[in-house]
Amino acid sequence: MGTNKPATLADLQKAINDISKDALSYLTAHKADVVTFAGQIEYAGYDAATLIGILKDKGGDTLAKDMTMCITMRYVRGTGFVRDVTKKVKVAAGSTEASTLVSRYGIVSSVGTNANAITLGRLAQLFPNVSHEVVRQISGVKMAVDSSDLGLTGCDNLLWDYVPQYIKLESETAPYCSTHSLSHILFVVHIIHSFQITKKTMPEGKKKERGLTKDIDMMKYTTGLLVITCKSKNLSDKKKEEGRKKVLDEFITNGKVKTTIFDALAGMSVNTISTYGNQTRLYLAQQSKLMKILAENTSKTATEVSGLVKEFFEDEAEGADD
């Protein structure tokens, strides 16, 4: 044990006070250095360029085919399929090709401590346009939490995990969206979906380890990760806009958002957001202008909330702006 250990309670309290005083003085004098350090260590998601480099190095002439097959694996069987392939369980036809892909690219079932690990989920998000076509054209795709689970009936196409790649936030800080943009609709939907799916699928041990056993902590965690994803520059603004319009196409007529999306959002408010505690709803209300409406009116009827959402969109300039 070090010789600097305080001998008495009074010594301990004095040491804490002295170090705190010195640390606060340092922060005051060197705030710029601390801010720079914070920016350097802040989690910013995986390095897409690193992943692309690995994929191109290992893929060669079959890269396009391989990515299509990997993304198909992700949406037909889920990210846990990698474990099945590795253990040679629950896999019949197609097992040889699946095993080859997992081995070739070093695909793992979860990120773990490797910030740039290659998972099926990351591949799907890295190539959102491919993912969009896979879920549209291939039967048997599934998600752990669908739109009916959120009271957002009929909106499954909005919930796929690649969709946040298309979202463009309006602000660097909360509230992240304030206008009636298509991004705003998708952002609100994914705040709730990312929370619900993580709460359902994350093992209890990991929740305790990360301090996520309370809804408010889980909501802050999942929203934080969503914001990081939305800020991704992997796609150009033009490609993001094209993606948003593809995803929301069925909810837009003549450049205007259909009332069906208003009703769906209202359903999410009264059926799902209403089940959250006050602290969680207060946090949600701070994230965007539309979410504020949904989080603060959960005691109203779905028809009333739908009317409020409709008013929000009509108060803005006409049209489904992007």
Curated annotation (Swiss-Prot):
Record localization: Virion; Host cytoplasm
UniProt-listed Pfam families: Tenui_N
Cellular component GO terms held in the UniProt record: helical viral capsid; host cell cytoplasm; viral nucleocapsid
Keyword RNA-binding tagged: yes
Residues where RNA binds: 43, 46, 76, 122, 240, 269
Keyword list, A-Z: Capsid protein, Helical capsid protein, Host cytoplasm, RNA-binding, Viral nucleoprotein, Virion
GO molecular function annotations of the record: RNA binding
UniProt keyword Transferase present: no
Taxonomy, superkingdom: Viruses
Domain notes for this protein: The N-terminus is involved in homooligomerization.
Family: Belongs to the tenuiviruses nucleocapsid protein family.
Role of this protein: Encapsidates the genome, protecting it from nucleases. The encapsidated genomic RNA is termed the nucleocapsid (NC), and serves as template for viral transcription and replication.
Protein name: Nucleoprotein
Organism of derivation: Rice stripe virus (isolate T)
